Amino acid sequence: MYPNSRYILPSLDERTAYGYKQVDPYTKLFEDRIVFLGVQIDDASADDVMAQLLVLEGQDAERDIIMYINSPGGSFTAMTAIYDTMQYIRPQIQTVCLGQAASAAAVILSAGTPGKRLALPNARILIHQPVVASSGYGQASDIEIQAREIMRMREWLEKTLAQHSNKSVKQVSKDIDRDKILSSEQALEYGLIDQILVSRKAGLGKK
């Protein structure tokens, strides 16, 4: 049994005017205006992503930001925080799905700048209705409040996915009743992405 099965990120030695400094791959990506969302979406990861987006806007509001996504999804409210920040800042955002963009991460993928939402050939995109943990206990009025909030979240999700795809709200509502798993080709047809990237060697990819 391995004591630590997680891949260890290498550090890079970089020469500066003050000598050498060690940086990790994520720092190098950030220097190239790349934000990597590779974890579950929760309050902590949302804060990290929002901070990076705001800093990059402050550095240059005219240059694009690239967001790579490989995430199983997560918190609805954390997702909406990232979503609102993406809509708020001035730079255009290219979103690229590597691996998977499930649940909340699928919304983030679709919210990239139109024409700049991409996925690799074997990427997996999953959409479904909001999932909210509930004990099922409490006063009737509290349960009613929770039910109304769940419906509000679902309505927001339906309208938002319809806005960022080529489907109607009615169709999205039907599709998210159960897990809907899309290949990159299916996500392209659905309108959640604009292009499939095959290889940098072959150019941008295919429509």
UniProtKB/Swiss-Prot annotation:
The active site is at S103 (nucleophile), H128. Keywords: Cytoplasm, Hydrolase, Protease, Serine protease. It is an enzyme of class 3 (hydrolase). Its EC number is 3.4.21.92. Coiled coil: none annotated. It is found in: Cytoplasm. Gene3D superfamilies: 2-enoyl-CoA Hydratase, Chain A, domain 1. InterPro entries: ClpP, ClpP/crotonase-like_dom_sf, ClpP/TepA, ClpP_His_AS, ClpP_Ser_AS. It catalyses: Hydrolysis of proteins to small peptides in the presence of ATP and magnesium. alpha-casein is the usual test substrate. In the absence of ATP, only oligopeptides shorter than five residues are hydrolyzed (such as succinyl-Leu-Tyr-|-NHMec, and Leu-Tyr-Leu-|-Tyr-Trp, in which cleavage of the -Tyr-|-Leu- and -Tyr-|-Trp bonds also occurs). The keyword Protease applies. One of its GO terms (cellular component) is cytoplasm. GO terms for biological process: protein quality control for misfolded or incompletely synthesized proteins. Pfam families: CLP_protease. Its main location: cytoplasm. One of its GO terms (molecular function) is ATP-dependent peptidase activity. Cleaves peptides in various proteins in a process that requires ATP hydrolysis. Has a chymotrypsin-like activity. Plays a major role in the degradation of misfolded proteins. Belongs to the peptidase S14 family. Fourteen ClpP subunits assemble into 2 heptameric rings which stack back to back to give a disk-like structure with a central cavity, resembling the structure of eukaryotic proteasomes. This is ATP-dependent Clp protease proteolytic subunit 1. It comes from Tropheryma whipplei (strain Twist) (Whipple's bacillus).
